[in-house]
A protein has these predicted regions:
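Structural signature of the Rossmann-like NAD(P)-dependent dehydrogenase/reductase core
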Residues: 12-16, 20, 65-71, 111, ...
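Protein kinase-like catalytic domain
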Residues: 6, 57, 95, 126-130, ...
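NAD(P)-dependent short-chain dehydrogenase/reductase
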Residues: 54-109, 115-117
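Active-site helix of classical SDR
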Residues: 41, 45
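Hydrophobic positions on the long internal alpha-helix
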Residues: 1-5, 12, 52-53, 121, ...
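Conserved Rossmann-fold NAD(P)-dependent oxidoreductase catalytic core, especially the SDR/UDP-sugar
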Residues: 1-40
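Hydrophobic alpha-helix immediately C-terminal to the catalytic Tyr-X-X-X-Lys motif of short-chain
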Residues: 48, 52, 56, 86, ...
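C-terminal substrate-binding subdomain of Rossmann-fold SDR/epimerase-dehydratase oxidoreductases
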Residues: 103-105, 111-167
């Protein structure tokens, strides 16, 4: 992709992820330039892509842009087993009148973003004037962070008998 962009003078958008971080990365107000030592192949490939994007911008002038997305959630796409899918799956359980078994530990906060907001962020970045960009590897973006109990409390306002347990 980057080599084709270099050859044809195209801009490249690469979605990255907070999965590019690791345990040593600061969890609060994560700096734009920070330590990235992920422990998963997913995270390693995201860091690799960020570094390659930076390299192609610096070496060849390829217009590379990326966003480090948090977990993306949607009311349209059914949960598919990802880490953040519990935040959608819990509503399916509530609507079906089922007890929800939460895969997370109590008090686990996760950063998430609504899919239309994620798309708008990507579009805004691609429409930005190139000379105004300070980074080429990836931009941190944030939207919301909550734990399972917060969602459960909100659901109980509408479905008082709703029950959630932890694995």
């Amino acid at each position: 992709e980057l080599e084709v962009a270099r050859e044809y003078g195209c801009a490249v958008f690469t979605p990255s992820s907070i999965g590019s971080f690791g345990e040593a990365t600061p969890h609060v107000k994560t700096p734009q330039d920070t330590i990235q030592r992920p422990r998963t192949m997913y995270g390693v490939t995201k860091v690799t892509t960020e570094l390659l994007s930076d390299y192609y911008y610096t070496k060849y002038g390829v217009d590379t842009r990326a966003v480090r997305f948090p977990g993306i959630i949607s009311n349209v796409t059914p949960p598919g087993g990802g880490t953040t899918d519990y935040a959608v799956d819990i509503f399916y359980s509530a609507v079906k009148g089922e007890k929800f078994v939460c895969p997370l530990k109590p008090g686990t906060y996760m950063d998430m973003m609504y899919m239309p907001d994620a798309l708008n962020a990507a579009i805004s970045l691609m429409e930005a004037i190139p000379t105004r960009l300070k980074h080429r590897n990836a931009f941190n973006i944030a939207a919301m962070s909550f734990d399972p109990e917060e969602i459960c409390r909100e659901i109980k306002k509408h479905v008082p008998d709703f029950e959630m347990v932890y694995e």
